Design a protein with these regions (language model features):
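Conserved ATP-binding/catalytic motifs of P-loop helicase motor domains
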Residues: 1-219
């Protein structure tokens, strides 16, 4: 699968693999946010990491914000079922119920990489709870317990859903507003892998629409 990566994807692959291959080098970024519009190959990247690392005998934990999204991942599951986080609690009281001697705690200790797919639908409180439980399980105070973590998603597409929540509440609750998000090194994919000849102009227009930078039309 690595041979199929384009130039931008290969750059992302190498940046994420660096701290995995050099676990004692704390100067390397260990937390990443992978941004890219729909069709840029984010899902392909996640499964490439999974296949490569599992082929090396390493453990990878791959989770998503919804069960439908999780089906696109290699051995995927939802983040709330894996990390025992109640997604309906949207306050600072959100916690993980993982026990230190449980099977998932053992997997976390062994994991070379943790991937959270469609993290744009994850609450800031869930991210905070994840950061805390990783530190607790790994028994250190380094960001995310020194684990290599990749969050990914496109804020142009899917945001979290809050029952009866209005726009202000949704914006306040996204992971970008979590203090623990500052540890993430930004990675970007730009090339649309789904476009065919003659469709790039429309793909560019969709990105402009998603960025909110289309010219305003006065009626």
């Amino acid at each position: 699968m690595v041979a199929q990566l384009n130039t931008g994807q290969r750059k992302v692959f190498d940046q994420v693999m660096a701290p995995i291959n050099q676990p004692t080098n704390l100067t390397l970024p260990r937390q990443f946010y992978l941004d890219g519009p729909g069709g840029s190959g984010k899902t392909f990247m996640y499964n490439t990491f999974g296949n490569v690392l599992e082929g090396q005998g390493k453990t990878v934990i791959m989770v998503a914000s919804t069960r439908i999204a999780a089906t696109l991942l290699l051995n995927g599951a939802t983040y709330h079922s894996t990390f025992k986080i109640d997604p309906s609690i949207i306050t600072d009281t959100t916690t993980s119920k993982i026990e230190e001697h449980s099977h998932i705690a053992k997997l976390i200790r062994e994991a070379s990489l943790i991937i959270c797919y469609e993290a744009t639908m994850m609450t800031r409180y869930a991210l905070k709870a994840l950061a805390k439980i990783l530190r607790k399980i790994m028994k250190n105070n380094l960001p995310y317990g020194k684990k290599v973590v990749v969050l990914g998603g496109d804020f142009r597409q899917c945001l979290l859903v809050i029952k009866h929540g209005k726009r202000v509440k949704m914006v306040e609750t996204i992971i970008k507003n979590c203090p623990f998000s500052s540890h993430f090194h930004q990675l970007k994919l730009h090339q649309n892998m789904r476009t065919v000849a003659g469709s790039q102009k429309h793909a560019d227009w969709l990105i402009t629409l998603g960025n909110g930078t289309l010219p305003r039309l006065e009626i």
